């Protein structure tokens, strides 16, 4: 029996929905990263982008454990002297919960070109409604 290796042409991608309501942001992001990479597929091939599409709903209801809401900061730098901007995660979760979830998922992907392609297959919505009903996504409940 020979091992089957996926190629770019033979990958069949599915759409999955993850509900982040009441769940820790890190666990939801880790599961999303595994689905985007294809690690949970039986035909996973490391050198081929074989991941699926992931829709995360209720991002505004995701939970940060511990004191992260007050102690964790989102930092950006413009490149100029004095150009550091810091935003507390409590404010970030109120204004842009999609960005907070995207940053968590991005941090759990590999740091290479394939990860950029995988991140394009991630869709995040703050509420329970999403715009991808035509793709017939499956709810991930394992």
Put a short name on every predicted segment.
Residues 1-103, 109-113, 131-142:
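Ribosome large-subunit tunnel/peptidyl-transferase-proximal elements
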Residues 117-134:
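Internal, active-site/partner-interface "lid" segment
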